[in-house]
Curated annotation (Swiss-Prot):
<dbReference type="InterPro" id="IPR015847">
    <property type="entry name" value="ExoRNase_PH_dom2"/>
</dbReference>
<dbReference type="InterPro" id="IPR036612">
    <property type="entry name" value="KH_dom_type_1_sf"/>
</dbReference>
<feature type="domain" description="KH">
    <location>
        <begin position="552"/>
        <end position="611"/>
    </location>
</feature>
<feature type="binding site">
    <location>
        <position position="485"/>
    </location>
    <ligand>
        <name>Mg(2+)</name>
    </ligand>
</feature>
<dbReference type="InterPro" id="IPR027408">
    <property type="entry name" value="PNPase/RNase_PH_dom_sf"/>
</dbReference>
<comment type="function">
    <text>Involved in mRNA degradation. Catalyzes the phosphorolysis of single-stranded polyribonucleotides processively in the 3'- to 5'-direction.</text>
</comment>
<dbReference type="InterPro" id="IPR003029">
    <property type="entry name" value="S1_domain"/>
</dbReference>
<dbReference type="GO" id="GO:0000287">
    <property type="term" value="F:magnesium ion binding"/>
</dbReference>
<keyword id="KW-0963">Cytoplasm</keyword>
<dbReference type="InterPro" id="IPR036456">
    <property type="entry name" value="PNPase_PH_RNA-bd_sf"/>
</dbReference>
<dbReference type="InterPro" id="IPR020568">
    <property type="entry name" value="Ribosomal_Su5_D2-typ_SF"/>
</dbReference>
<dbReference type="InterPro" id="IPR004087">
    <property type="entry name" value="KH_dom"/>
</dbReference>
<dbReference type="GO" id="GO:0005829">
    <property type="term" value="C:cytosol"/>
</dbReference>
<dbReference type="Pfam" id="PF03726">
    <property type="entry name" value="PNPase"/>
</dbReference>
<protein>
    <recommendedName>
        <fullName>Polyribonucleotide nucleotidyltransferase</fullName>
        <ecNumber>2.7.7.8</ecNumber>
    </recommendedName>
</protein>
<dbReference type="GO" id="GO:0003723">
    <property type="term" value="F:RNA binding"/>
</dbReference>
<feature type="domain" description="S1 motif">
    <location>
        <begin position="621"/>
        <end position="689"/>
    </location>
</feature>
Length: 713
């Protein structure tokens, strides 16, 4: 075993690439470390092409092992199970920038597996995994147009920060991941605290500049390894087939792409395609329907792209900057806490907001430890939204990714827990889809949150931009259709308020996207965003003053932290009785914060009254009404507050001499008593005879029903 090692400085971190020791039966394997965060990345590529597929079969699996953080997994089996949402999102983060760099026509199956084996809590493993995937592909010999590199960019105190630590990120106004080659940016994923277009573009450019050191290091590493490239040549173009399909379909296909309604257009194109396949086979030009279909798709692309570059109307007749017709409604579901219907052209989302209590927060077990997520946004894309049948089940990678993007778009305007103590779940149900359903989810989420009475800082809207770039020029498209996304060169999604950007996602399929193109796209996206926000404001301008009648009311009070045990009671008896008898949910924090939630406000008020009674301090010289709970030879014990009894000595019952306590008091009697003393041990001395003075004020009787524990003597 002859290890090959390459180390270099990347911002504040030292990165090491190593190969030649482990997983030698894989096509390539690299251990990447960045300040004790180690990710082992393997690449396996099949030597035989899978010609039965009409897409490149690339699979990326990112997996975190709990041993990396020195922990044993929870659960019955004590081992890692299905990928978490975070692992799925990181798999997509690796996949998106490398997929467009495999050559067209390459159909050999490739699998990238990234395993986190050691984690420094300050260094997130996602950037490390992306670097490792690039390095492994670079030394694999598989046809690949890389290497790529990745960088995380923060923005603090007006300055960009390269690869901020997990401790620095909470103070950053930006969390942006950018990936690209030496010459081009390929992917951007970001969340921002309402930043300007200039700051966002600057972050992308800064990250691309800083990552050049990684690209250079990977090139040197690959040269040291010296793997021979695969002997692969792209499939030759069948010029006769290309010409025949153009002859048979150009005119008719051109007319089909002037049909504005998606379903009708697809039906027309499908009929043309079937006829062309039959005619081409009959003519003896090609007998493989799959190859005919691929060339037919190429003709579709040339027709649509050519029209756009020549300045002709788009598929649905719009000009490049025009937004599809908008329709907005709120409060569409009577029992939901907040709901909205957002429609943009043939893309539509029903979005529903639900308010819950602290116990409804999502508990997430990560390598860095446990955390509770108080804001959830889930995106569902059922097959009927595109007029198809299909399997229904757990969310797929795409749904998880789109949900996270929509969440990023809205997160910056969400109130803090102190401002709004509710846990919030938003669900976006896509009911129609023809491009940019994730951005429809952003718009619908903003509307539903306002309808639910969540005090968000501002309305948020999202828009998807596209690009068609040819030798003769380029055109940036606003509010792209599904076909324009599929046939174009860029998917550029921007969410934000009137003041700035909250989320930016960019996926580019070609090299050569310049700063100028990104500037135009951001400027055009701002105009589109402001237009959408104006329409949304006509439906609802500000969060509703009151939450839904069907949402729980949360009341927060503070008690002495030393009294928490009294509210809980022995074995939880007191708090259990409180919740069952009042119909509320009660949550306590170690600092004495108590949150009481109930749909009925009266129930919450009753629970608060009883908690305040339980935690009240006994005041010396104050008169209370209490119930006699025990008799003794030397006096009587009287309960004056929940869980708090005091002793009325036999000499303090009356002015007359008392021989037998039972002659004057019986169990259950309600009497007025005055507090004479509370000693250091918390024992309370009471007097009935001194309480009978007519000038003294009487405290309310204790809520005896709240007492679940026998009082201590």
């Amino acid at each position: 075993m002859n290890p090959i090692v390459k180390s270099f400085q990347y911002g504040q971190h030292t990165v090491t690439l190593e190969t030649g020791v482990m997983a030698r039966q894989a096509t390539a394997a690299v251990m990447v470390s960045m300040d004790d965060t180690c990710v082992f990345v393997t690449v396996v590529g099949k030597k035989e092409a899978d010609h039965g597929r009409d897409f490149f079969p690339l699979t990326v699996n990112y997996q975190e092992r709990t041993y990396a953080a020195g922990r044993i997994p929870g659960g019955f089996f004590r081992r890692e199970g299905r990928p978490s949402e975070g692992e799925t999102l990181t798999s997509r983060l690796i996949d998106r920038p490398i997929r467009p760099l495999f050559p067209e026509g390459f159909l050999n199956e490739v699998q990238v597996v990234a395993t986190v084996m050691s984690v420094n809590p300050l260094v997130s493993p996602d950037i490390v995994a992306m670097i490792g995937a690039s390095a492994a592909l670079a030394i694999s010999g598989i046809p690949f147009g890389g290497p790529i590199a990745a960088a995380r960019v923060g923005y603090m105190n007006g300055q960009y920060v390269l690869n901020p630590t997990t401790a620095e990120l909470p103070q950053s106004d930006l969390d942006l991941v950018v990936a690209g080659t030496a010459n081009a940016v390929l992917m951007v994923e970001s969340e921002a605290a309402i930043l300007s277009e200039e700051v966002m573009l600057g972050a992308v450019v800064y990250g691309h500049e800083q990552m050049q050191v990684v690209i250079n290091a990977i090139n040197e590493f690959a040269a040291d390894v010296g793997t021979q490239p695969w002997d692969w040549t792209p499939p030759a173009t069948n010029e006769a087939l290309k010409a025949k399909i153009a002859e048979l379909a150009t005119a008719e296909l051109g007319e089909a792409y002037r049909i504005t309604e998606k379903a009708v257009r697809y039906a027309a194109i499908g009929a043309i395609k079937q006829r062309v396949i039959e005619q081409v086979i009959a003519a003896g030009v090609e007998d493989d329907a799959k190859k005919i279909g691929e060339e037919f798709h190429s003709l579709e692309s040339r027709i649509v792209r050519g029209r756009v570059v020549r300045g002709e109307p788009r598929i649905d007749g719009r000009d490049p900057e025009m937004i599809r017709a908008l329709s907005v409604g709120t409060g569409i579901l009577p029992r939901a806490h907040g709901s909205a219907l957002f429609t943009r052209g043939e893309t539509q989302a029903i979005v529903v907001a639900t308010l819950g209590t602290e116990r409804d927060a999502q508990n997430i077990d990560e390598l860095a430890g446990h955390r509770a997520d108080r804001f959830m946004l889930h995106y569902n894309f059922p097959p009927y939204c595109v007029g198809e049948t299909g399997m229904m089940g757990s969310p797929k990678r795409r749904e998880i990714g789109h949900g996270r993007l929509a969440k990023r778009g809205v997160a910056a305007v969400m109130p803090s827990a102190a401002e709004f103590p509710y846990v919030v779940r938003v669900v976006s149900e896509i009911t129609e889809s023809n491009g940019s359903s994730s951005m429809a989810s952003v718009c619908g989420s903003s509307l539903a949150l306002m309808d639910a009475g969540v005090p968000i800082k501002a309305s948020v809207a999202g828009i998807a931009m596209g690009l068609v770039k040819e030798e003769e020029g380029f055109v940036v498209l606003s509010d792209i259709l599904g076909d324009e996304d599929h046939l174009g060169d860029m998917d550029f999604k921007v969410a934000g308020t009137t003041q700035g950007i909250t989320a930016l996602q960019m996926d580019i399929k070609i090299e050569g996207i310049t700063k100028e193109i990104m500037e135009i796209a951001l400027k055009q996206a701002r105009g589109a965003r402001l237009h959408i926000l104006k329409v949304m404001d006509e439906a609802i301008q500000a969060p509703r003053a009151e939450i839904s009648d069907f949402a729980p009311r949360i009341h927060t009070i503070k008690i002495n932290p030393e009294k928490i045990k009294d509210v809980i009671g022995k074995g939880g008896s007191v708090i259990r009785a409180l919740t069952e008898e009042t119909g509320t949910n009660i949550e306590l924090d170690d600092d004495g914060t108590v949150r009481i939630s109930a749909v009925a406000n009266e129930a919450a008020m009753e629970a608060i009254r009883r908690i305040e009674a339980i935690t009240a301090e006994i005041e010396v010289n104050r008169i209370y009404e209490g119930k006699v709970v025990r008799l003794a030879d030397f006096g009587a014990f009287v309960n004056i507050l929940p869980g708090k009894d005091g002793l009325v000595h036999i000499s303090q019952i009356t002015d007359a001499r008392v021989q037998n306590v039972a002659d004057f008091l019986k169990l259950g009697d309600v009497v007025k008593v005055k507090v004479l003393e509370v000693d250091r041990q918390g024992r309370v001395r009471l007097s009935i005879k001194e309480a009978n003075a007519p000038t003294e004020a009487v405290a309310p009787a204790a809520d005896v029903a709240a007492v679940e524990e026998p009082a201590a003597e």
